[in-house]
């Protein structure tokens, strides 16, 4: 990967909670609307980003998926800047035919293939899903182009991959990173800081 400018600052956020998050359904690249809680999380992220960044105009990169776009629109109410740049490299990995199913349903169909989030290799076994290598390449491509302060609104597995790639973590380490809603990960100077409300 091309070296990242040490002065680059990335404020990485996961979209707010969705109906499918609440229901335990795998989303991948299918969409599900934010819940009332998810909209509140996005509002809180906007306020927190405004406190961290002041009222200076900030560039926002966002996944093209509806839940990320909705989160970015709510954040923009607090953080001024140009229209967000929609970048498909920030979208969630595709989970193929598993999208919309619960983990239990996938296990019933696929003889117990699903593990827990501490052993997330099962994500890359989805029929018609995205491979680890392809997923890693698109994240690397996005990350290598970042040159200034940017807010990135993305997804659970994608935020794991971005942070892991930035830190140079192993495959297992990056797939084990936590992905709560309502936090900001600040990537700068070769480190990642988790910022809570």
Residue ranges and their predicted role:
Residues 74, 161, 165:
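Active-site signature of alpha/beta-hydrolase-fold catalytic machinery across serine-
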Residues 5-82, 109, 130:
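Active-site-proximal alpha-helix that buttresses catalytic centers in soluble enzyme cores
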Residues 32-33, 78-138, 176, 188, ...:
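Phosphate-handling substructures
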Residues 166-195:
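Domain-level recognition of soluble alpha/beta enzyme cores
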Residues 18, 158-159:
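Short active-site segment of divalent metal-dependent hydrolases/proteases
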Residues 49, 74-79, 140-148, 186-187:
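Alpha-helix C-terminal capping segments
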Residues 10, 58, 148-157:
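Generic beta-sheet signal
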């Amino acid at each position: 990967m091309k070296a990242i400018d040490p002065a680059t600052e990335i404020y990485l956020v996961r979209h707010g909670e969705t109906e499918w998050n609440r229901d335990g359904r795998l989303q991948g690249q299918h969409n599900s609307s934010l819940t009332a809680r998810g909209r509140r999380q996005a509002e809180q992220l906007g306020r927190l980003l405004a406190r961290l960044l002041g009222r200076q105009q900030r560039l926002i990169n966002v996944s093209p998926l509806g839940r990320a776009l909705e989160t970015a629109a709510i954040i923009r109410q607090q953080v001024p800047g140009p229209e967000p740049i929609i970048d498909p490299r920030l979208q969630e990995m595709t989970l193929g035919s598993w999208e919309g199913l619960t983990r239990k349903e996938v296990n019933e169909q696929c003889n117990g293939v699903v593990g827990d989030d501490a052993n997330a290799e099962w994500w890359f076994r989805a029929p018609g899903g995205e491979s680890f290598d392809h997923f890693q390449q698109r994240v690397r491509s996005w990350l290598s182009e970042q040159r200034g302060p940017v807010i990135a609104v993305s997804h659970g597995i994608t935020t794991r991959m971005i942070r892991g790639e930035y830190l140079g973590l192993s495959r297992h380490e990056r797939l084990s990173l936590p992905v709560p809603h309502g936090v900001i990960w600040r990537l700068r100077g070769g480190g990642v800081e988790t910022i809570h409300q």
